[in-house]
Design a protein with these regions (language model features):
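Active-site-adjacent bridging/hinge elements
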Residues: 24-40, 100-120, 139, 304-309, ...
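Histidine-centered active-site/metal-ligand motif
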Residues: 55, 165, 249-250
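Conserved glycine(s) of the Walker
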Residues: 134
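Conserved pre-motif I regulatory segment
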Residues: 27-128
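Accessory nucleic-acid engagement/destabilization modules that flank
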Residues: 1-37, 44, 50, 122, ...
Length: 715
């Protein structure tokens, strides 16, 4: 049930296909949502975490979407389609696969002449959120929201199912749920069950006291049972699922069948899609909230992105390029990395940035003349010092000339004159010390970790610390064929270098295949080189996910916004900012290199499609004229009481009902007696009456919000 992809014009004509986010456009302007729908606290997550504004905005649009579907349209899919999507989405979707047609008809869908009326699968909304934006926290809060709205009887009672396509993502979800549950009353915690336990839970053998949520691997759903694969019919639940999908697309030959199964599972429920890489037109049109890579970067949560005009075509094994050409491009990349490392050295006493890293992602690893092998050969030659001074100077001059007028994606950013001058002063000895951890050239030595079949370390014999890590599926072919003649030593003190790469500042280069990069989170990448990644939708998704994982920034512990934004928000003092500002842009940037023109266009196209409208960074932020030119100090924090803002009438409702007997309130709301004591003794200090706050007016909803907020906050 894929919509036909619209033809896209060439970037050469400067025409970019901007997705139509129809549902988001409507929800952003929807203002008549009844107050009861906002009865839960959207910001509280745990004693250590609260949601960013953009995460709360995602939940607010989830509320608006559910309100529109269930309250304004009465849960009627045809009415929802007519009101929101008529004339935007086609009335019917063609289905050419007879097995899918039979499957849909079997489960009660109407399919006429191989066409499915679109309204039948329109009970859905998507959340287009960048890798690294914390969408898992939003998913956990969405579970709490659904439970709260079901308890208030404003949406139907249904079971909740969470699906994602990898075990590590399930593990990540479990970890966030565990943190969310800490300190909550039993009825408020989320209880996770593997989907195979569904019958036990529903039959009462395992009786949950909290919010039951089922989970499973999305890619293991099928039409028959086999090993870990499950027959979806055994968990059909009459289509009454609130189905939450997190990156639940694998892109293989069974994708269409799985998407059909997902639509069947939520036929009488609702579907929530979370992804950093939407590609189908229906995903964009039904998108309720957008905080994609472009928004993530523009609002200062990620690094600036620069896509180099330099062409890595010399690493295409099918073409005959000279060793000098390979050497020049590697020199440019290494000089750039050296410059960023040196910039970080200048500010690290004041701002605790990551250690910059070069990430090399290749398509082939072990075949003859593989992408990895060609890159490694070039690395070896430079490490040995087999370059002419004129070649080094030429590479440096070309790099500086390119960076002088560098056009960063999404923003109007320029590298400082100070940084460009620093690049001019870099010597080959600086490069050896910064990149290769050595003061002089040398031959490469291979460091193997016994029992570790996926990692190899590389160091220069002239140095004392490894400088590079290779992470691939199996190192055996490399040891046997590619590294013949190299000295191989064994290292016993570490079993998994990759797992500790964020803390290990010695490693400056990470080389890996496409497969290894899934699920890796790090602030460290400043340069990414894609070598022969291919083209098409799969390559675009990989590029987007890779760049998304490389843009994370954390100048101070647990503060994940760029320094300029922190300065404008008065989170650092003016003196500190003035001392480091000339060096921050390269450290807060991700420089992307691609193999050849077609690959580079894939990257450009992917990034261009992330932009809804033309904006510059200056358009997004305003400096308060009252504070311009004045000293902005770093605030010092002290413990203070928590404050909940409520409409005055809601506060009076709370005051009145707090006079009820403890046993009644504990029984009705599962609130801890200590919370009741705290609220009775300090209500005026803890709850501020403000007329601009939404009025709820329903005692049950007011008390749920009050107790929910302070039950989490009081430790």
């Amino acid at each position: 049930m894929r919509l036909k992809e619209k033809d896209r014009r060439s970037l050469d004509n400067s025409v970019i296909s901007i997705p139509n986010l129809r549902l988001k456009t409507i929800l952003d302007t929807l203002e008549d949502v009844e107050e009861v729908w906002y009865a839960i606290d959207l910001s509280a997550f745990s004693s250590k975490k609260t949601l960013f504004d953009y995460q709360k905005n995602a939940l607010e649009n989830a509320i608006k979407g559910l309100y529109y579907f269930y309250s304004k349209c009465g849960g009627n899919k045809e009415e929802f389609f007519e009101n929101v999507y008529k004339g935007i989405l086609p009335e019917t979707l063609p289905i050419r696969n007879k097995k899918l047609i039979d499957l849909l008809k079997e489960e009660g869908f109407v399919v006429d002449e191989n066409k499915l009326p679109t309204y039948q699968i329109i009970n859905r909304m998507g959340f287009w959120m960048a890798t690294g934006s914390g969408k898992t926290l939003v998913i956990v809060k969405l579970v709490e929201l659904l439970s709260g709205l079901m308890n208030l009887k404003v949406i139907p009672q249904k079971d909740i199912l969470f699906l994602t396509h990898r075990d590590d993502l399930i593990g990540q979800f479990k970890g966030h749920v565990k943190e969310f549950n800490e300190g909550r009353m039993p009825s408020k915690i989320i209880q996770l069950y593997e989907l195979k336990d569904y019958e036990d839970v529903k039959s009462g053998l395992d009786n949950p006291t909290g919010i039951p949520v089922f989970y499973y691997r999305a890619d293991l759903f099928d039409t028959e049972e086999k090993e870990k694969r499950v027959n979806f019919r055994n968990y059909l639940n009459n289509g009454n699922w609130y189905l939450i999908l997190d990156e639940a697309h694998k892109g293989d030959k069974d994708e269409s069948k799985r998407q059909t199964i997902f639509n069947i599972l939520c036929k009488n429920g609702f579907r929530f899609d979370f992804s950093a890489t939407f590609t189908e037109e229906i995903d964009f049109i039904t998108c309720a909230y957008n905080f994609n890579l472009a928004e993530f970067v523009k609002q200062g949560y990620g690094k600036h992105i620069y896509v180099s005009g330099e062409n890595l075509r010399s690493f295409n094994r099918r073409d005959d390029f000279s060793q000098e050409e390979k050497q020049k491009i590697l020199l440019k990349i290494f000089i750039l990395l050296t410059g960023i490392i040196k910039a970080r050295e200048k500010v690290k006493d004041r701002v605790h940035y990551h250690k910059p890293l070069l990430l090399v992602l290749v398509n082939s690893v072990s075949v003859d003349d593989s992408d990895m092998e060609l890159f490694f050969r070039g690395l070896v030659n430079i490490a040995k010092g087999q370059i002419q001074d004129s070649d080094f100077q030429g590479a440096k001059d070309e790099l500086i000339q390119e960076l002088k007028n560098a056009n960063f994606r999404f923003e109007n950013v320029r590298l400082s004159r100070e940084f460009l001058n620093l690049l001019r002063e870099i010597t080959f000895e600086d490069l050896l010390e910064s990149v290769f951890n050595s003061k002089s050239p040398g031959t490469i030595e291979v460091v193997q970790i016994p029992q570790n079949r996926q990692e190899l370390l590389f160091k220069l014999k002239s140095g004392d610390k490894p400088f590079a890590l290779m992470k691939i599926g199996d190192i055996t072919p490399w040891l046997r064929k590619k590294l013949e003649g190299y000295e191989i030593v064994e290292r016993f003190e570490e079993e998994n270098i990759f797992a500790k790469l964020n803390e290990d500042e010695d490693i400056n280069i990470l080389m890996g295949s496409r497969a290894f990069y899934e699920g890796w989170d790090s602030n460290r990448p400043n340069v990414i080189a894609f070598i022969n990644i291919g083209m098409g939708e799969d390559a675009k998704k990989f590029v987007l996910q890779s760049i998304g994982r490389g843009v994370r920034i954390e100048p101070f512990k647990n503060i994940r916004r760029r320094l300029e934004i922190l300065h404008k928000n008065s989170q650092i003092d003016k003196e500190t900012y003035q001392q480091v500002k000339d060096w921050t842009t390269p450290i807060e940037s991700l420089f992307v290199f691609g193999t050849k023109a077609s690959n580079l266009e894939t990257i450009l196209q992917t990034l261009a499609e992330q932009t809804e409208e033309e904006e510059t960074l200056g358009d997004l932020f305003e400096i308060n004229p009252e504070v311009q030119g004045k000293l902005l100090l770093v605030p010092e924090y002290k413990e203070s009481e928590l404050i909940l803002r409520m409409h005055p009438e809601d506060k009076e409702i709370a005051r009145e009902f707090l006079e009820l007997d403890d046993r009644i309130l504990v029984c009705m709301f599962d609130v801890h007696p200590k919370v009741l004591i705290k609220l009775r003794n300090n209500l005026d200090a803890l709850v501020h009456a403000e007329h601009q706050e939404r009025k709820i007016g329903i005692p049950e909803a007011v008390l749920k919000r009050l107790f929910g907020y302070f039950s989490v906050k009081f430790r």
